[in-house]
Amino acid sequence: MISKIKKDLENKISKTIKELALKQNITLDKINIIMKKPPKSELGDLSILIFEFSKILKLSTSVIIEEIIKQIGKKYTTKSMGAYLNIKFNRKEYIKDIIKKVNEQKEKYGINNVLKNKRIIIEFSSPNTNKPLHVGHLRNDIIGESLSRILKASGGQVTKINLINDRGTHICKTMLAYKKFGNNTTPELSLKKGDHLIGDFYVKYNEYAKNNKMAEDEIQQLLCKWEEGDEETVKLWKKLNKWAIEGIKETYKLTNITFDKIYLESEIFKIGREIILQGLEKGLCYKREDGAICINIPIETNEMTDQKFKQKVLLRANGTSIYLTQDLGNILTRKNEFDFDEMIYVVGSEQIHHFKTLFYVADKLGITKENNLVHLSYGMVNLPTGKMKSREGHVIDADNLIHDLSESTMIEIKKRHSNEQDSKKIALNISLGAIHYYLLKTAIHKDILFNKEESLSFTGNSGPYIQYVGARINSILDKYDELNLPSKNINFDLLINENEWAIIKIISEFEEYIIKAAKDRNPSIIVNYSYLLAKSFSAYYQDTKIIDKDNPELTHARTDLSKAVLQTIKNCMHLLNIPYMKKM
């Protein structure tokens, strides 16, 4: 709604400025209209900077403002304040329009078309099959899932992709440890999820390697056997990968993370080699004296000199590929399959240099333009005791974290719910809300120190707090339904409380927040918005009697406002992959 009003004002102001420029014989290349919220609400709802136009048109601000007011008409209340023109909306009409729009559009409220028809691929998660998902993976997963939903809400045609890394030396490490220490155990025999069992052997290998100098040679021998297709080795590889992937998929299901396409690296890693050989034929890369195929990539420098380059190997002298080569094959595969306009990689900040190089080479080899590829880098998730290290077992496993948080809430939940299954479901939903919100609320590029107690807080900027406000509003609406008050046309003119107006303005900005989150590729924008709305409603609820059986008209209006708040909060929760609960 606010977007529509701003667009209307922009069109009318632009028209006025163009007409004035024509009269002044001034040519304008671009009209930049700056709108913002006034510092105080009593000054208006929007403030428009006029001073810049005064300089360009060589006219006083009062003359320009007078002409703009003529163009705007009586639809808005206007007031000149120095270099600004302040706009006040017609509150009665605005409140009615917003509440009706939200309650009619329901889950579609906030959806827009700024990315209409844009084909977007987003690759995220991309786990290794040598360990279970940990809290760092959870941050990757929730960023990818949430951003996908935000991009879809803005009209994008989004395809979610997961590339599972199921080959290489790190996989061979678990295979070697299983051969030495496994004793033919299985997930069923060990009473463990497959990914957790595999993770145990990854840790065992690293313990073994500390005291055995030949461990690395054993890994290389095992890798060679796998590459040669040795039957026994491939059979073991398939078995362990199957256990790991089944376990990882269970965690995806638990956390409500989904993908449109899952690739296995073992099935596509050879494609990149052909791309390099074709590039060599076309003269896009070159062969070094030792037989390695290389390309020159620019070196970042602060010197004011000609661009410097360094050599980058794409195929080793023995014909084997590097990770970058395999990634080039992945880009081509997806370009052919989906013909994307943009591909986003959600990968940690430690890979920034890799992706800069990858995107440059992909462009030079003619696979796709560099600006069609995006590395959405995110900060690491650290523990109070320091950085996580999977090889040492120093991690918070995703499954264990969810279980731990669920158990922490069960004592309180059991006081309110006698049914064991209901209690467990509520506890799980609270823990997921806590984790997803906590991992999204910090700006993506920043590192996080995960704090379990803070994530579970019901009184602060947290997922459980948002869930609680949603459940509280649902309780209000249930009480309203029980009263069965005589229904009639709702009189929204009764909503004259300043807190009500503040809430309405926040609701009306929802679409703008989604657009900004999509353009910035930043789900934390929606997190901050959801907290702002929930906090505003909580303050309103504390100070205001929403249901008053002695005043049915006002009750109808206030409960309809509450419905609009709840719907908007639910829409936020969907974008953030936070479970909504009617009761907590």
UniProtKB/Swiss-Prot annotation:
Residues that span the membrane, as ranges: none
InterPro entries reported for this sequence: aa-tRNA-synth_I_CS, Arg-tRNA-ligase, Arg-tRNA-synth_N, Arg-tRNA-synth_N_sf, ArgRS_core, DALR_anticod-bd, Rossmann-like_a/b/a_fold, tRNAsynth_Ia_anticodon-bd
Subcellular location, record wording: Cytoplasm
Top-rank lineage group of the source organism: Bacteria
Catalytic activity entry: tRNA(Arg) + L-arginine + ATP = L-arginyl-tRNA(Arg) + AMP + diphosphate
GO biological process, one term: arginyl-tRNA aminoacylation
Pfam hit, one: tRNA-synt_1d
EC number of this enzyme: 6.1.1.19
Primary site of residence: cytoplasm
GO cellular component, one term: cytoplasm
Gene3D superfamilies: Arginyl tRNA synthetase N-terminal domain, HUPs, Isoleucyl-tRNA Synthetase, Domain 1
Motif mapping: 'HIGH' region: 127-137
Molecular-function GO terms, alphabetical: arginine-tRNA ligase activity; ATP binding
Record's keyword terms, sorted: Aminoacyl-tRNA synthetase, ATP-binding, Cytoplasm, Ligase, Nucleotide-binding, Protein biosynthesis
Assembly description: Monomer.
Matching NCBIfam families: argS (TIGR00456)
Protein family according to the UniProt entry: Belongs to the class-I aminoacyl-tRNA synthetase family.
PANTHER family membership: ARGININE--TRNA LIGASE, CYTOPLASMIC (PTHR11956:SF5), ARGINYL-TRNA SYNTHETASE (PTHR11956)
Annotated protein name in UniProt: Arginine--tRNA ligase
The organism of origin for this protein: Borrelia turicatae (strain 91E135)
